[in-house]
Protein backbone atom coordinates (compact mmCIF):
# COMPACT_ATOMS: atom_id res chain seq x y z
CA UNK A 1 0.00 0.00 0.00
CA UNK A 2 1.38 3.43 -0.95
CA UNK A 3 1.70 6.31 1.46
CA UNK A 4 -1.19 8.14 -0.17
CA UNK A 5 -3.54 5.18 0.09
CA UNK A 6 -2.44 4.35 3.62
CA UNK A 7 -2.90 7.81 5.08
CA UNK A 8 -6.08 8.38 3.08
CA UNK A 9 -7.61 5.23 4.51
CA UNK A 10 -6.60 6.17 8.04
CA UNK A 11 -7.81 9.77 7.82
CA UNK A 12 -11.13 8.60 6.36
CA UNK A 13 -11.56 6.06 9.14
CA UNK A 14 -10.62 8.67 11.74
CA UNK A 15 -13.28 11.06 10.45
CA UNK A 16 -15.85 8.28 10.29
CA UNK A 17 -14.92 7.26 13.81
CA UNK A 18 -15.46 10.81 15.02
CA UNK A 19 -18.85 10.89 13.32
CA UNK A 20 -19.96 7.64 14.96
CA UNK A 21 -18.38 7.95 18.40
CA UNK A 22 -16.36 10.42 20.40
CA UNK A 23 -13.71 7.82 21.20
CA UNK A 24 -10.51 8.66 19.36
CA UNK A 25 -8.50 6.11 17.41
CA UNK A 26 -4.77 5.80 17.74
CA UNK A 27 -2.79 7.38 14.89
CA UNK A 28 -0.78 5.18 12.53
CA UNK A 29 2.76 4.28 13.43
CA UNK A 30 5.29 6.60 11.90
CA UNK A 31 7.33 3.62 10.73
CA UNK A 32 4.64 2.77 8.20
CA UNK A 33 5.01 6.18 6.61
CA UNK A 34 8.81 6.39 6.45
CA UNK A 35 8.84 4.42 3.19
CA UNK A 36 6.71 7.07 1.49
CA UNK A 37 8.22 9.71 -0.73
CA UNK A 38 8.53 13.31 0.42
CA UNK A 39 6.07 14.45 -2.24
CA UNK A 40 3.42 12.00 -1.03
CA UNK A 41 3.94 13.09 2.56
CA UNK A 42 3.61 16.76 1.65
CA UNK A 43 0.41 15.97 -0.26
CA UNK A 44 -1.04 14.13 2.71
CA UNK A 45 -0.09 16.92 5.12
CA UNK A 46 -1.87 19.46 2.91
CA UNK A 47 -4.91 17.17 2.64
CA UNK A 48 -5.13 16.68 6.41
CA UNK A 49 -4.71 20.44 6.93
CA UNK A 50 -7.67 21.10 4.62
CA UNK A 51 -9.75 18.45 6.40
CA UNK A 52 -8.91 20.07 9.72
CA UNK A 53 -10.15 23.43 8.45
CA UNK A 54 -13.44 21.85 7.32
CA UNK A 55 -14.12 20.03 10.60
CA UNK A 56 -13.20 23.09 12.64
CA UNK A 57 -15.55 25.25 10.56
CA UNK A 58 -18.37 22.70 10.99
CA UNK A 59 -17.74 22.73 14.74
CA UNK A 60 -18.07 26.53 14.91
CA UNK A 61 -21.20 26.51 12.73
CA UNK A 62 -22.81 23.83 14.92
CA UNK A 63 -21.96 25.83 18.06
CA UNK A 64 -23.63 28.93 16.63
CA UNK A 65 -26.71 26.94 15.58
CA UNK A 66 -27.00 25.39 19.05
CA UNK A 67 -27.38 28.88 20.47
CA UNK A 68 -30.12 29.71 17.97
CA UNK A 69 -31.89 26.41 18.65
CA UNK A 70 -31.96 27.13 22.37
CA UNK A 71 -33.21 30.66 21.73
CA UNK A 72 -36.04 29.17 19.66
CA UNK A 73 -37.05 26.92 22.56
CA UNK A 74 -36.99 29.83 24.99
CA UNK A 75 -38.88 32.18 22.66
CA UNK A 76 -41.68 29.66 22.15
CA UNK A 77 -42.02 28.97 25.87
CA UNK A 78 -44.31 31.98 26.71
CA UNK A 79 -46.93 30.72 24.26
CA UNK A 80 -46.80 27.20 25.72
CA UNK A 81 -47.00 28.61 29.25
CA UNK A 82 -50.04 30.72 28.41
CA UNK A 83 -51.70 27.76 26.71
CA UNK A 84 -51.09 25.53 29.72
CA UNK A 85 -52.50 28.26 31.96
CA UNK A 86 -55.69 28.35 29.91
CA UNK A 87 -55.96 24.56 30.04
CA UNK A 88 -55.56 24.60 33.81
CA UNK A 89 -58.23 27.22 34.33
CA UNK A 90 -60.58 25.61 31.83
CA UNK A 91 -60.18 22.36 33.71
CA UNK A 92 -61.21 24.14 36.90
CA UNK A 93 -64.30 25.56 35.23
CA UNK A 94 -65.63 22.19 34.10
CA UNK A 95 -65.57 18.65 35.36
CA UNK A 96 -63.16 17.06 32.89
CA UNK A 97 -63.84 13.60 34.28
CA UNK A 98 -67.47 13.79 33.12
CA UNK A 99 -66.85 14.92 29.55
CA UNK A 100 -65.72 13.02 26.51
CA UNK A 101 -63.02 14.69 24.42
CA UNK A 102 -61.53 12.87 21.41
CA UNK A 103 -57.89 13.52 22.36
CA UNK A 104 -58.33 12.52 26.01
CA UNK A 105 -60.41 9.42 25.38
CA UNK A 106 -58.75 6.30 26.76
CA UNK A 107 -59.52 2.84 25.46
CA UNK A 108 -57.91 -0.61 25.60
CA UNK A 109 -54.60 -0.47 23.75
CA UNK A 110 -54.39 -2.84 20.80
CA UNK A 111 -52.21 -0.86 18.40
CA UNK A 112 -49.54 1.78 19.08
CA UNK A 113 -48.14 4.42 16.72
CA UNK A 114 -44.50 5.27 17.43
CA UNK A 115 -43.36 8.67 16.11
CA UNK A 116 -39.55 8.65 15.77
CA UNK A 117 -37.66 11.95 15.39
CA UNK A 118 -34.19 11.69 13.84
CA UNK A 119 -31.80 14.10 12.15
CA UNK A 120 -31.74 15.26 8.56
CA UNK A 121 -27.95 14.89 8.25
CA UNK A 122 -25.09 12.78 9.50
CA UNK A 123 -21.70 13.61 11.02
CA UNK A 124 -23.33 14.05 14.42
CA UNK A 125 -21.78 11.24 16.43
CA UNK A 126 -24.08 8.57 17.80
CA UNK A 127 -27.12 10.87 17.86
CA UNK A 128 -29.19 9.10 15.20
CA UNK A 129 -27.95 5.65 16.19
CA UNK A 130 -29.07 6.11 19.81
CA UNK A 131 -32.57 7.16 18.77
CA UNK A 132 -32.94 4.26 16.33
CA UNK A 133 -31.67 1.76 18.91
CA UNK A 134 -34.26 3.10 21.35
CA UNK A 135 -36.92 2.64 18.67
CA UNK A 136 -35.86 -0.97 18.08
CA UNK A 137 -35.98 -1.62 21.82
CA UNK A 138 -39.47 -0.16 22.11
CA UNK A 139 -40.67 -2.18 19.12
CA UNK A 140 -39.38 -5.36 20.77
CA UNK A 141 -41.23 -4.43 23.97
CA UNK A 142 -44.48 -3.94 22.06
CA UNK A 143 -44.02 -7.31 20.38
CA UNK A 144 -43.52 -8.99 23.75
CA UNK A 145 -46.72 -7.36 25.01
CA UNK A 146 -48.58 -8.76 22.01
CA UNK A 147 -49.49 -5.30 20.68
CA UNK A 148 -49.61 -4.22 17.06
CA UNK A 149 -47.55 -1.19 16.10
CA UNK A 150 -46.76 1.17 13.28
CA UNK A 151 -43.96 3.71 12.87
CA UNK A 152 -44.14 7.35 11.78
CA UNK A 153 -40.60 8.37 10.84
CA UNK A 154 -39.56 12.03 10.84
CA UNK A 155 -36.11 12.86 9.43
CA UNK A 156 -34.04 11.62 6.50
CA UNK A 157 -31.83 9.34 8.60
CA UNK A 158 -34.78 7.59 10.19
CA UNK A 159 -36.60 7.37 6.86
CA UNK A 160 -33.65 5.62 5.21
CA UNK A 161 -33.28 3.30 8.21
CA UNK A 162 -36.87 2.08 8.22
CA UNK A 163 -37.12 1.89 4.42
CA UNK A 164 -34.26 -0.62 4.48
CA UNK A 165 -36.25 -2.74 6.96
CA UNK A 166 -39.52 -3.72 5.29
CA UNK A 167 -40.43 -5.99 8.21
CA UNK A 168 -41.14 -2.87 10.32
CA UNK A 169 -44.58 -1.43 9.39
CA UNK A 170 -44.04 2.18 8.32
CA UNK A 171 -47.15 4.36 8.38
CA UNK A 172 -45.52 7.47 6.90
CA UNK A 173 -42.08 9.00 6.46
CA UNK A 174 -41.84 12.76 6.78
CA UNK A 175 -39.10 15.33 6.36
CA UNK A 176 -38.79 18.63 8.20
CA UNK A 177 -36.90 21.81 7.41
CA UNK A 178 -33.48 22.58 8.82
CA UNK A 179 -35.17 24.84 11.38
CA UNK A 180 -38.42 23.33 12.74
CA UNK A 181 -41.50 25.43 12.10
CA UNK A 182 -45.16 25.28 13.05
CA UNK A 183 -45.87 23.94 9.56
CA UNK A 184 -43.60 20.95 10.23
CA UNK A 185 -45.21 20.17 13.58
CA UNK A 186 -48.69 20.66 12.12
CA UNK A 187 -48.06 17.96 9.50
CA UNK A 188 -47.13 15.49 12.25
CA UNK A 189 -50.02 16.66 14.43
CA UNK A 190 -52.59 16.17 11.66
CA UNK A 191 -51.32 12.65 10.97
CA UNK A 192 -51.35 11.40 14.57
CA UNK A 193 -54.66 13.16 15.20
CA UNK A 194 -56.34 11.35 12.32
CA UNK A 195 -54.82 8.01 13.34
CA UNK A 196 -56.03 8.36 16.93
CA UNK A 197 -59.49 9.84 16.34
CA UNK A 198 -60.29 7.29 13.62
CA UNK A 199 -59.27 4.57 16.13
CA UNK A 200 -56.68 3.14 13.76
CA UNK A 201 -54.34 3.31 16.75
CA UNK A 202 -55.19 3.43 20.44
CA UNK A 203 -52.04 5.16 21.63
CA UNK A 204 -49.43 7.50 20.12
CA UNK A 205 -45.90 7.65 21.51
CA UNK A 206 -43.22 10.19 20.61
CA UNK A 207 -39.54 9.19 20.61
CA UNK A 208 -37.02 12.02 20.44
CA UNK A 209 -33.67 13.04 21.88
CA UNK A 210 -33.94 15.32 24.89
CA UNK A 211 -31.21 17.94 25.19
CA UNK A 212 -29.34 17.46 28.49
CA UNK A 213 -25.96 19.07 27.86
CA UNK A 214 -23.53 19.78 25.05
CA UNK A 215 -22.04 16.31 25.44
CA UNK A 216 -25.16 14.35 26.36
CA UNK A 217 -28.64 13.82 24.98
CA UNK A 218 -31.08 11.19 26.21
CA UNK A 219 -33.58 9.49 23.86
CA UNK A 220 -36.92 9.49 25.67
CA UNK A 221 -40.43 8.26 24.88
CA UNK A 222 -43.40 10.48 25.67
CA UNK A 223 -47.08 9.61 25.37
CA UNK A 224 -48.72 12.05 22.97
CA UNK A 225 -52.21 10.55 22.80
CA UNK A 226 -54.39 10.14 24.74
CA UNK A 227 -53.60 13.53 26.27
CA UNK A 228 -54.10 14.75 29.80
CA UNK A 229 -56.60 17.63 29.91
CA UNK A 230 -54.65 19.10 32.83
CA UNK A 231 -51.66 20.03 30.69
CA UNK A 232 -49.48 17.16 31.89
CA UNK A 233 -46.82 15.22 29.99
CA UNK A 234 -46.91 11.47 30.57
CA UNK A 235 -44.30 8.83 29.83
CA UNK A 236 -45.00 5.31 28.57
CA UNK A 237 -45.43 4.04 32.13
CA UNK A 238 -48.28 6.46 32.79
CA UNK A 239 -46.23 8.73 35.07
CA UNK A 240 -47.35 12.31 34.43
CA UNK A 241 -45.29 15.43 35.06
CA UNK A 242 -46.62 18.94 35.45
CA UNK A 243 -45.93 20.67 32.15
CA UNK A 244 -45.43 24.02 33.89
CA UNK A 245 -42.40 22.64 35.71
CA UNK A 246 -39.47 22.59 33.34
CA UNK A 247 -35.71 22.92 33.18
CA UNK A 248 -34.28 25.93 31.41
CA UNK A 249 -30.98 25.45 29.66
CA UNK A 250 -28.75 28.47 29.14
CA UNK A 251 -25.82 28.13 26.77
CA UNK A 252 -22.98 30.26 28.15
CA UNK A 253 -19.20 30.49 28.08
CA UNK A 254 -17.02 29.53 31.01
CA UNK A 255 -13.24 29.83 30.93
CA UNK A 256 -13.38 30.23 27.16
CA UNK A 257 -15.44 27.05 26.65
CA UNK A 258 -19.12 26.47 25.94
CA UNK A 259 -21.13 25.18 28.88
CA UNK A 260 -24.77 24.79 29.91
CA UNK A 261 -26.37 26.24 33.01
CA UNK A 262 -29.45 24.42 34.29
CA UNK A 263 -32.18 26.00 36.35
CA UNK A 264 -35.48 24.40 37.34
CA UNK A 265 -38.37 26.81 37.42
CA UNK A 266 -41.99 26.49 38.46
CA UNK A 267 -44.52 28.67 36.70
CA UNK A 268 -47.43 29.75 38.85
CA UNK A 269 -50.69 29.92 36.96
CA UNK A 270 -53.01 32.78 37.83
CA UNK A 271 -56.74 32.10 37.90
CA UNK A 272 -59.04 33.95 35.55
CA UNK A 273 -60.80 37.02 36.80
CA UNK A 274 -64.38 36.37 37.96
CA UNK A 275 -65.61 38.82 35.34
CA UNK A 276 -64.25 36.69 32.50
CA UNK A 277 -67.06 34.96 30.66
CA UNK A 278 -66.81 32.34 27.94
CA UNK A 279 -68.97 33.05 24.93
CA UNK A 280 -68.79 29.40 23.86
CA UNK A 281 -69.25 26.21 25.76
CA UNK A 282 -66.07 25.52 27.79
CA UNK A 283 -66.06 21.98 26.46
CA UNK A 284 -65.90 23.29 22.89
CA UNK A 285 -63.08 25.65 23.82
CA UNK A 286 -61.14 22.86 25.48
CA UNK A 287 -61.76 20.61 22.49
CA UNK A 288 -60.21 23.30 20.26
CA UNK A 289 -57.27 24.04 22.57
CA UNK A 290 -56.07 20.45 22.98
CA UNK A 291 -55.00 20.05 19.31
CA UNK A 292 -53.17 23.37 19.59
CA UNK A 293 -51.43 22.14 22.72
CA UNK A 294 -50.56 18.89 20.95
CA UNK A 295 -48.99 20.89 18.12
CA UNK A 296 -46.93 22.94 20.58
CA UNK A 297 -45.60 19.79 22.26
CA UNK A 298 -44.54 18.30 18.91
CA UNK A 299 -42.82 21.56 17.94
CA UNK A 300 -41.02 21.59 21.28
CA UNK A 301 -39.80 18.02 20.70
CA UNK A 302 -38.56 18.97 17.21
CA UNK A 303 -36.64 21.91 18.65
CA UNK A 304 -35.08 19.81 21.41
CA UNK A 305 -34.13 17.13 18.91
CA UNK A 306 -32.45 19.74 16.71
CA UNK A 307 -30.52 21.15 19.67
CA UNK A 308 -29.34 17.63 20.59
CA UNK A 309 -28.29 16.94 16.99
CA UNK A 310 -26.30 20.17 16.74
CA UNK A 311 -24.60 19.56 20.09
CA UNK A 312 -23.66 16.04 18.97
CA UNK A 313 -22.32 17.38 15.67
CA UNK A 314 -20.26 20.00 17.48
CA UNK A 315 -18.75 17.32 19.72
CA UNK A 316 -18.08 14.98 16.77
CA UNK A 317 -16.41 17.70 14.72
CA UNK A 318 -14.31 18.69 17.73
CA UNK A 319 -13.08 15.11 18.01
CA UNK A 320 -12.46 14.96 14.25
CA UNK A 321 -10.43 18.17 14.45
CA UNK A 322 -8.32 16.71 17.26
CA UNK A 323 -7.73 13.58 15.19
CA UNK A 324 -6.68 15.68 12.20
CA UNK A 325 -4.24 17.66 14.34
CA UNK A 326 -2.71 14.46 15.69
CA UNK A 327 -2.47 12.86 12.26
CA UNK A 328 -0.89 16.00 10.82
CA UNK A 329 1.66 15.97 13.64
CA UNK A 330 2.62 12.35 12.93
CA UNK A 331 2.86 13.00 9.20
CA UNK A 332 5.08 16.02 9.84
CA UNK A 333 7.37 13.94 12.05
CA UNK A 334 7.60 11.26 9.36
CA UNK A 335 8.27 13.94 6.72
CA UNK A 336 11.06 15.53 8.76
CA UNK A 337 12.67 12.15 9.45
CA UNK A 338 12.49 11.19 5.80
CA UNK A 339 13.93 14.54 4.75
CA UNK A 340 16.72 14.29 7.32
CA UNK A 341 17.59 10.77 6.21
CA UNK A 342 17.68 11.90 2.59
CA UNK A 343 19.98 14.84 3.36
CA UNK A 344 22.25 12.62 5.48
CA UNK A 345 22.45 10.09 2.67
CA UNK A 346 23.37 12.77 0.15
CA UNK A 347 26.11 14.11 2.46
CA UNK A 348 27.52 10.61 2.92
CA UNK A 349 27.56 10.11 -0.84
CA UNK A 350 29.43 13.40 -1.33
CA UNK A 351 31.96 12.51 1.37
CA UNK A 352 32.45 9.04 -0.06
CA UNK A 353 32.96 10.49 -3.54
CA UNK A 354 35.49 13.00 -2.25
CA UNK A 355 37.39 10.25 -0.43
CA UNK A 356 37.42 8.14 -3.58
CA UNK A 357 38.84 11.01 -5.64
CA UNK A 358 41.43 11.78 -2.97
CA UNK A 359 42.50 8.14 -2.79
Curated annotation (Swiss-Prot):
Record's signal peptide: none
Source domain of life: Eukaryota
Keywords, in A-Z order: ATP synthesis, CF(1), Chloroplast, Disulfide bond, Hydrogen ion transport, Ion transport, Membrane, Plastid, Thylakoid, Transit peptide, Transport
A Gene Ontology biological process term: proton motive force-driven ATP synthesis
Positions of the catalytic residues: 124
UniProt GO cellular component terms: chloroplast thylakoid membrane; proton-transporting ATP synthase complex
Pfam family, one: ATP-synt
Any GO MF annotation of the entry: proton-transporting ATP synthase activity, rotational mechanism
Localization of this protein: Plastid, Chloroplast thylakoid membrane
Annotated organelle transit peptide span: 1-35
Main location: plastid
Bilayer topology term: Peripheral membrane protein
Keyword Transit peptide carried by entry: yes
Disulfide pattern: 234-240
Record's function text: Produces ATP from ADP in the presence of a proton gradient across the membrane. The gamma chain is believed to be important in regulating ATPase activity and the flow of protons through the CF(0) complex. Inceptin is a proteolytic fragment produced by insect larvae that previously ingested the protein. This peptide mediate plant perception of herbivory through the induction of volatile, phenylpropanoid and protease inhibitor defenses such as ethylene, jasmonic acid and salicylic acid for example.
Family membership noted in the UniProt record: Belongs to the ATPase gamma chain family.
Subunit structure: F-type ATPases have 2 components, CF(1) - the catalytic core - and CF(0) - the membrane proton channel. CF(1) has five subunits: alpha(3), beta(3), gamma(1), delta(1), epsilon(1). CF(0) has four main subunits: a, b, b' and c.
Protein name (record): ATP synthase subunit gamma, chloroplastic
Taxonomic path: Eukaryota, Viridiplantae, Streptophyta, Embryophyta, Tracheophyta
Amino acid sequence: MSCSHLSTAWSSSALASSASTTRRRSPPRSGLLVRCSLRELRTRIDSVRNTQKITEAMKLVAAAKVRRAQEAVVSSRPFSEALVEVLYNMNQEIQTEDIDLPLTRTRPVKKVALVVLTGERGLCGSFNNNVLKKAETRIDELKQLGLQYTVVSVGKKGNAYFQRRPYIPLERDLEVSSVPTVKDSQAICDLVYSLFVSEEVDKVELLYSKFVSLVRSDPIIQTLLPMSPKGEICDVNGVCVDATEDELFRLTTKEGKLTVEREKVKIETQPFSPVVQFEQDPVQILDALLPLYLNSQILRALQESLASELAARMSAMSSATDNAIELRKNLSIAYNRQRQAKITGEILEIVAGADALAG
